[in-house]
Swiss-Prot record:
SUPFAM superfamilies registered for this protein in UniProt: Thiolase-like (SSF53901)
Keyword Nuclease (UniProt): no
Role, per record: The primary product of this enzyme is 4,2',4',6'-tetrahydroxychalcone (also termed naringenin-chalcone or chalcone) which can under specific conditions spontaneously isomerize into naringenin.
Organism: Ipomoea batatas (Sweet potato)
Pfam families: Chal_sti_synt_C (PF02797), Chal_sti_synt_N (PF00195)
Keywords: Acyltransferase, Flavonoid biosynthesis, Transferase
Domain of life: Eukaryota
Active-site residues, record numbering mapped to chain: C164
Protein's name according to its UniProt entry: Chalcone synthase DII
Designated gene of the protein: CHS-DII
Length: 393
């Protein structure tokens, strides 16, 4: 007769959870940030609001974004004029698009990750799907399982309405799943499209306009597992993961799903709330490792917007190159909510390899991944990079 303890021991993995592959995807429709204000005010029939347009132009100019990808094309917006008003009942039409397109974009990212992983998809044991775009039953996790042709016994977790911190959350959950289930291979997918948040401008709600200047569409997928086989190629190890609520930050970032879609509300002091609380998170994460020099680790921070990055950089005395990968993704894609940090992970390992650096983390051993979002919630993940083997010359 076996004991519970013996069963439990056999269930656990030996080593730490490891990122084994990363894939990303965006819609085909690309919008240029410099010309976006003209397009946005034209398509929303708001060209007469000249002062507001000038404000929006300044927001876009200061956003540090070059381009974004959006499922919503001019054609779709003309077919759905209610999306272009500030507060028109439009949830049904938004849902009809999101429920189909969110898993579809997620599938593209997942296929890319599975291809890099190089293992049969039948080895995927768990699926974690995260989106702030469109709620349904059965959810996007179910749709993705069907689209990819995964086994019916795959164990699914669906995360709706988490927001911008959730790229950290999915890694935290994948770590626990991989380390507590021997042989588990967890497919995590963050898929975000702005169809639920797009709306026309309002003079009285400039925080809504901030979102229109920043948000973009994208999906990222990561495969996580412990004890990699010789055929698998580890990219990063997940060492620890924490979540905390910043004190006195209630209402800093809110989102409400209404008949008019998903409305976002931001307080002006979000950058200072993040920058004032980030060092405590760093200390708690890295003190056990004996690390206190924040320039000695590689950085993957959710790029909520340029002001957050600037204040974090300033508060911690970070060298400008520390946030290079983060700023690159913000510039090339905008704020894709939960998917952003996974895009940054992808950018970092690729740039590290291309530059001939020794590790996947810009040549450094230890790194940190931050998610910031509604709550104000901060996710902190400690990463350990992997040595890059020199390719054949």
């Amino acid at each position: 007769m076996v004991t519970v303890e013996e069963v439990r021991k056999a269930q656990r993995a030996e080593g730490p959870a490891t990122i084994l592959a990363i894939g990303t995807a965006t819609p085909a429709n690309c919008v240029n940030q410099s010309t976006y204000p003209d397009y946005y005010f034209r398509i929303t029939n708001s060209e007469h609001k000249t002062e507001l347009k000038e404000k929006f132009q300044r927001m876009c100019d200061k956003s540090m974004i070059t381009k974004r990808y959006m499922h919503l094309t001019e054609e779709i917006l003309k077919e759905n004029p209610s999306f272009c008003e500030y507060m028109a009942p439009s949830l049904d039409a938004r849902q009809d698009i999101a429920v189909v397109e969110v898993p579809k974009l997620g599938k593209e990212a997942a296929q890319s990750a599975i291809k890099e992983w190089g293992q049969p998809k039948s080895k995927i044991t768990h699926v974690v799907f995260c989106t702030t775009s469109g709620v349904d039953m059965p959810g996007a996790d179910y749709q993705l399982t069907k689209l990819l042709g995964l086994r019916p016994s795959v164990k699914r977790l669906m995360m709706y309405q988490q927001g911008c911190f959730a790229g950290g959350t999915v890694l935290r959950l994948a770590k626990d799943l991989a380390e507590n289930n021997k042989g588990a291979r967890v497919l995590i997918v963050c898929s975000e499209i702005t169809v639920v948040t797009f709306r026309g401008p309002s003079e009285t709600h400039l925080d809504s306009l901030v979102g229109q200047a920043l948000f973009g569409d994208g999906a990222a997928a990561v495969i996580v597992g412990a004890d990699p086989t010789p055929a698998e190629k580890p990219l990063f190890q997940l060492v620890s993961a924490a979540q905390t609520l910043a004190p006195n930050s209630c209402g800093a970032i809110d989102g409400h799903l209404r008949e008019v879609g998903l409305t976002f509300h931001l307080l002006k002091d979000v950058p200072s709330v993040v920058s004032n609380n980030i060092e405590k998170c760093l200390f708690e994460a890295f003190n056990p490792l004996g690390i206190s020099d924040w320039n000695s680790v590689f950085w993957i921070a959710h790029p909520g917007g340029p002001a957050i990055l600037d204040q974090v950089e300033d508060k911690l005395g970070l060298k400008p190159e520390k946030l290079r990968a983060t700023r690159h993704v913000l510039s090339e894609y905008g704020n894709m909510s939960s998917a952003c940090v996974l895009f940054i992970l992808d950018e970092m390992r690729k740039a590290s390899s291309n530059a001939g650096l020794g590790t996947t983390g810009e040549g450094l051993e230890w790194g940190v991944l931050f998610g910031f979002g509604p709550g104000l919630t901060i996710e902190t993940v400690v990463l350990h990079s992997v040595l890059i083997k020199p390719g054949p010359h």
